From Swiss-Prot:
It comes from Staphylococcus aureus (strain bovine RF122 / ET3-1). GO terms for molecular function: L-serine ammonia-lyase activity; nucleotide binding; pyridoxal phosphate binding; threonine deaminase activity. This is L-threonine dehydratase catabolic TdcB. Catalyzes the anaerobic formation of alpha-ketobutyrate and ammonia from threonine in a two-step reaction. The first step involved a dehydration of threonine and a production of enamine intermediates (aminocrotonate), which tautomerizes to its imine form (iminobutyrate). Both intermediates are unstable and short-lived. The second step is the nonenzymatic hydrolysis of the enamine/imine intermediates to form 2-ketobutyrate and free ammonia. In the low water environment of the cell, the second step is accelerated by RidA. The gene is tdcB. The lineage of its organism: Bacteria, Bacillati, Bacillota, Bacilli, Bacillales. One of its GO terms (biological process) is isoleucine biosynthetic process.
Amino acid sequence: MTTNTVTLQTAHIVSLGDIEEAKASIKPFIRRTPLIKSMYLSQSITKGNVFLKLENMQFTGSFKFRGASNKINHLTDEQKEKGIIAASAGNHAQGVALTAKLLGIDATIVMPETAPQAKQQATKGYGTKVILKGKNFNETRLYMEELAKENGMTIVHPYDDKFVMAGQGTIGLEILDDIWNVNTVIVPVGGGGLIAGIATALKSFNPSIHIIGVQSENVHGMAESFYKRDLTEHRVDSTIADGCDVKVPGEQTYEVVKHLVDEFILVIEEEIEHAMKDLMQRAKIITEGAGALPTAAILSGKINNKWLEDKNVVALVSGGNVDLTRVSGVIEHGLNIADTSKGVVG
């Protein structure tokens, strides 16, 4: 593959070469996740060929492990010796914690005091020190930065980092390996590291691949920034897609997104719940809210059919770390509003 004029605009931030190097760097650690065809989304909804990229089957249950492992692999021996630190309420924390365990590095994770007990325990399970501090993520982040400065630890950012973006971009290379003639790729978006990496990989190969970002109506800082062409914050309420609950996107990720992403779709909370339920019922896939965003966009009918009908489409299921109580609630709500016993399965 060669870098084309489209991706040259953002090559100073992250390039195809960075992603190919990341692929080699993280290969011993990650799982190459499956890409499966959804008969339901293909035959009954889009009249296209819709495939699901199952990052919910990645180690730690999320794509975040890719970026975290690539970033940490590139630290100097001195940085590794002093230890690493991250602020996260969920998937990034587990990605950092597992990588640190595999490489024998001391890691500290600072979580908001409101972090779900299940995610606290999962992170501690990797032998990582977990500190609960702050009533919201901003307070948590500020405390984490203080600790890093005091102790000389290296911060592993969840998205606004070249090596993190490159690690996430390896998903794009895997998609191309499986479906070289993919037409449309639909990606959940929070801070933007995932879509920035994937867009770089895909557009380097074929600039005509249509890349769609999906966010919740409640929290869509990146979509707002994309259409205003200026870094902007947006959050009016919480979202079931908590993995994408990022008020202000990254500065570096935004620069990549504004050049390489084609459009954004916004979905409401009920549409995300419906997608989670349908993925469970039809495809037998358990996903968190963020992982259901691309499917929600397809089911909502908000994507122009020209990008779906007779096209090879990939919808990314970014993670599956969801509390069982939430799964139970989604199922119960779904059963109350629809008959889920009929229709195409898969």
